[in-house]
């Protein structure tokens, strides 16, 4: 019984030692004061990728036109790329039609991204025309920067090749490269 009492007393002393810090008193023995409270962990706010530029080139050996969307600090993870009919060239938020030159169109959507700064100023071109150094891309035009969704439309000289051939998107750290087949 004495052994159990001694162990439980040691356990209490150990627990109290972890919870309190002994501070010498001015007049006499030590006094016990509570340890400083630990502040709650502040959650880390994710940084929104911001579109900072757009460039285009032709890769003859791969038979594709490349449209590169440059972001800071990193490219967004969620990107969709697909051919769409002219009837789907609509402005995000308002639903108004967006005029884009071309015979067929690619819609590029970046989720959890922005194309503006804190004051609402555009951080990337909203319209690239004419697009030089490509064989198929005619125009790259903004379709919206609304509630964390950035949309661009790419107008093409050639008709869409059919459902078996689709444009692709590749992440390269700070960029998303959209590859559009040419003939």
PLM segments and residue spans:
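Secretory targeting and sorting signals
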Residues: 1-27
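Short linear recognition/processing motifs and adjacent strand/loop elements at protein termini
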Residues: 24-183
């Amino acid at each position: 019984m004495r052994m159990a009492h001694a162990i439980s007393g040691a356990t209490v002393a150990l627990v109290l030692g972890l919870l309190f810090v002994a501070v010498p008193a001015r007049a006499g023995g030590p006094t016990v004061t509570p340890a400083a409270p630990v502040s709650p962990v502040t959650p880390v706010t994710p940084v929104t990728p911001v579109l900072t530029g757009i460039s285009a080139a032709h890769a003859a050996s791969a038979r594709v036109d490349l449209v590169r969307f440059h972001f800071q600090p990193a490219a967004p993870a969620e990107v969709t790329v697909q051919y769409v009919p002219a009837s789907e060239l609509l402005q995000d938020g308002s639903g108004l039609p967006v005029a884009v030159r071309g015979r067929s169109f690619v819609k590029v959507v970046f989720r959890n991204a922005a194309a503006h700064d804190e004051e609402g100023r555009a951080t990337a071109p909203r319209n690239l025309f004419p697009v030089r150094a490509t064989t198929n891309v005619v125009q790259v035009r903004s379709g919206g920067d609304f509630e964390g969704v950035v949309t661009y439309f790419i107008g093409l000289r050639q008709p869409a090749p059919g459902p078996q051939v689709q444009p692709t998107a590749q992440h390269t750290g700070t960029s998303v490269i959209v590859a559009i087949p040419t003939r």
